[in-house]
């Protein structure tokens, strides 16, 4: 009896899956219109839809949301620029903070790996605090552009003395790409995105503290010598995040219009990607609308 059940069920299952695969996907019949071509800043632009599609994705044409850059991951001729704020206080020890870059650090957080890597000291490219919060200024890292990633590190040195070892705070860290034409595109948009890891080479009681707003370290008087590193994740200096669209429709129900407000004047190429699809097939149409914001 069990054999007969299997013989009946298996053909039925085979039929089900073959039928599912044969379901034909049609191209979306989808169009977009606007009431006018020119709008004011902060005025809602209403896009009216006709036809239908399973999914619709919206690219508003602003920086970071351009359809033509949806697969872009690098930029030729870009200038990588590093910035951060520092605050060094308490204690009179000098030369306690260094800014370094490595092309060959293997990412292993131990003394041997850190020391085996070649670290280039670029501290002299930055303005460091002498007691109050100061900006590093814009640090050009163009000379480190190459195939493969780099790591950026802060190295802290404190000596066992009768005066406190200096306390350092690093905030507002960012690494951006200045693209041809002047657009600024993020590589590491903020300190929390740096993928920081720390390692104490000497003076294990003290180490870099990693928080979302800052990196900080310090020690009291008469404490053992300290050498502590905090290092970013691997960074590609010419890399950029692909531009992203906004999903405004899925299978949950129909959408007949969509409104968007622009904060800056300019001419925008707005793109809607309409898709019909399932796990076996996918068809799409792309609709463009030009709008001017004044």
PLM features: residue spans?
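Residue-level recognition of secondary-structure-to-loop junctions
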Residues: 256-264
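Short beta-strand segments within Ig-like beta-sandwich modules, predominantly Fibronectin type-III
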Residues: 247-254
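C-terminal motif of bacterial Sec signal peptides marking the signal peptidase cleavage site
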Residues: 15-18
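Extracellular carbohydrate recognition and processing domains
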Residues: 114-144
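Extracellular beta-strand-rich recognition modules
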Residues: 80-88, 97, 101, 147-158, ...
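Short, solvent-exposed loop/turn segments at the edges of extracellular beta-sandwich modules
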Residues: 159-161, 275-281
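Acidic/polar, low-complexity intrinsically disordered N-terminal segments immediately downstream
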Residues: 20-95, 105-108, 265-267, 281, ...
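Exposed low-complexity, polar/acidic, P/S/T/G-rich flexible segments that act as propeptides
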Residues: 161-202
């Amino acid at each position: 009896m069990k054999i007969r059940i299997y013989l009946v069920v298996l053909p039925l299952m085979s039929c089900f899956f073959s039928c599912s695969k044969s379901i034909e996907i049609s191209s979306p019949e989808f169009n977009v219109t606007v009431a006018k071509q020119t709008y004011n800043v902060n005025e809602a632009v209403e896009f009216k839809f006709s036809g239908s599609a399973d999914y619709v994705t919206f690219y508003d044409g602003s920086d970071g949301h351009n359809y033509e850059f949806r697969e872009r991951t690098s930029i030729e001729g870009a200038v990588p620029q590093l910035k951060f704020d520092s605050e060094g206080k308490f204690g009179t020890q000098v030369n306690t903070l260094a800014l370094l870059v490595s092309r060959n650090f293997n990412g292993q957080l131990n003394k041997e790996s850190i020391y085996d890597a070649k670290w280039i000291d670029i501290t002299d490219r930055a303005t460091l605090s002498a007691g109050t919060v100061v900006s590093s200024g814009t640090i050009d890292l163009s000379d480190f552009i190459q195939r493969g990633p780099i790591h950026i590190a802060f190295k802290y040195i404190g000596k066992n003395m009768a005066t406190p070892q200096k306390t350092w705070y690093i905030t507002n860290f960012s690494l951006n790409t200045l693209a041809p034409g002047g657009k600024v595109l993020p590589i590491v948009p903020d300190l929390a995105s740096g993928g920081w890891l720390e390692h104490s080479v000497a003076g294990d009681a003290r180490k870099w503290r990693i928080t979302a707003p800052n990196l900080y370290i310090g020690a009291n008087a008469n404490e053992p010598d300290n050498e502590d590193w905090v290092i970013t994740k691997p960074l590609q200096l010419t890399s950029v995040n692909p531009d992203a669209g906004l999903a405004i429709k899925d299978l949950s129900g129909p959408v007949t219009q969509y409104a968007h407000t622009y904060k800056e004047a300019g001419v925008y190429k707005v793109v809607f990607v309409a898709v019909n699809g399932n796990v076996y097939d996918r068809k799409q149409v792309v609709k463009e609308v030009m709008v001017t914001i004044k």
